[in-house]
Amino acid sequence: MNAPTSESTSGLGFEVDRDHVGWLTFDRPDSSVNTLTPLLMQELDALLSQLESRIANGQIFALVLRSGKEGSFIAGADVEAIAALSSAADARAASAEGQRIFRRIERLRVPTVAAVDGACMGGGTELILHCDYRVASDRNSTVIGLPEVRLGILPGFGGTVKLPPLVGMQNALGIILSGKPVRPSRAKRIGLIDEVVAAARFRSAVSEFVAGVIGNRVERAPPTLGFGQRLLERMLPAQVQ
């Protein structure tokens, strides 16, 4: 088998392992935590174009999104960038751009798995909501939330639309309107997380989960997956514009 191949940008890393699983790593070198800065979002958009091509060529069977920061997944959007928005039109444009990029993840023609080991907040939570599956570690620092309301704003990258179908309207309203984070155990009970695994063997546990996903879907041809995705998009509410 071929050895893993890797590529990197200033905020993202990417490698493909011997099982044809892509590992997309968020790891800002200039910060102790990951935030979704405008630059990082641009890099993600560009990397997704490369991924779409490699997926179409049959080089990648599944994609894992993870953090390179121990004990922290993604802290959210860039607060300074939000504060710099000077008008409602600018805010709408920034929100629409984030939604567009996250929808590209949602529409990838391979299973996508968010591997959450540590705090996952705001835009990080909205990111994982656009993945097919979510696996979280049992680390003490692992929490998932949408704290935007505490800043006087609402989730802008699709969280208000993506969360209710997963956890039900009552649970979704509680998470969005309180801004309080959810621990992995409760997240699994309400359907926000698919699996909680030991932090001590997180990568191997995620690999096992992904192998199971690939095994369950190996008989499905890409055109069938694409048709199913388009059908679901028509049935579910449209993204907030």
Protein language model features and the residues they cover:
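Conserved CoA-thioester-binding segment of acyl-CoA-metabolizing enzymes
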Residues: 1-66, 100-103
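Intrinsically disordered, low-complexity segments enriched in small/flexible residues
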Residues: 2-4, 9, 38-41, 47, ...
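Glycine- (often His-adjacent) and acidic-residue-rich active-site loop
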Residues: 67-101, 120, 150-152
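Glycine-rich beta-to-alpha active-site loop
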Residues: 68, 104-151, 155
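Receiver (REC) domain switch/active-site residues of two-component response regulators
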Residues: 132, 193-194
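Hydrophobic, secondary-structure "cap" segments at the distal end of domains
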Residues: 160-170
